A protein has these predicted regions:
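Short, glycine/charge-rich beta-strand/loop segments that flank catalytic centers
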Residues: 4-22
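Helix-start/capping segments and mature chain N-termini
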Residues: 16-19, 23-228
């Protein structure tokens, strides 16, 4: 009964490590504890979201650990995300710390951009999470004959794609949200609303991966594990 059975809900399993040495000091701890959180969760986002492209604050900087699921990467997001929420957005699209001109992540999710029939996603680096859902999407795209390219995507290219009509979809992917469609983004005070398209990739990818997760289809990749 503790494991949710509603569609979109799940038992979120998250391993973590924290320092336990009985001392307060400016040095790494000599003792740590490993634990696993098992938490029932509902659907992260129930509908498409609006995001703000960040121009001032940064999630991670080169030379850091933005690629990892580390608590410090989340703490720095809280304040700018609250500002974005007060402005009518649900999440922030993070940009590179050096120039704020290249998109990196959407909230706590990796981000995908569809220009024409091609999907683009930023390559992983020390500032971009090496997400397991991102890896899964790249695998599914290959088998679904969806062309995908890993390369930096600038804010200017995103806006140009919107203006020319080449921008078809924008969505984030992650373990909590799975696939979260973005139907509006804001940049420098201007709002850009993305119209629905025929044969969208985001719901197809979400259905494909959730069907595998829920055992509705075969798992040719060996992604499912029985938890006892």
């Amino acid at each position: 009964a503790w494991i949710p059975t509603d569609e979109g809900s799940s038992l979120y399993i998250r391993p973590y490590v924290f320092a336990t040495e009985a001392a307060i000091k400016a040095n790494p701890s000599l003792e740590y504890r490993f634990a696993i959180i098992c938490s029932p969760v509902s659907a992260y986002f129930s509908s498409a979201i609006a995001v703000k492209i960040e121009e001032r604050f940064s999630r991670a900087a080169p030379g850091g650990f933005g690629y990892a699921k580390a608590a410090g990467n989340y703490a720095g997001q809280f304040y700018p995300t609250e500002i974005a929420k007060a402005e009518g957005y649900q999440q922030v699209v993070w940009t590179d710390a050096n120039t704020h001109s290249f998109i990196e992540e959407a909230g706590t999710m990796n981000i995908f951009v569809r220009l024409g029939d091609k999907l683009l996603t930023s390559p992983t680096s020390d500032t971009i999470l090496d997400g397991i859902t991102r890896k899964s999407m790249l695998t599914l795209c290959k088998d679904l004959d969806i062309e995908v390219e890993e390369r930096p995507v600038s804010v200017a290219e995103l806006i140009k794609g919107f203006e020319t009509g080449e921008l078809k979809e924008l969505f984030g992917v992650g373990t909590a949200a799975v696939v979260s469609e973005i139907n509006r983004f804001g940049y420098q005070g201007i709002q850009y609303s993305i119209d629905e398209v025929e044969n969208p990739y985001a719901p197809l990818l979400k259905k494909t991966i959730t069907d595998i997760q829920l055992g509705r289809t075969e798992d040719p990749y060996g992604w499912r594990y029985e938890i006892i």
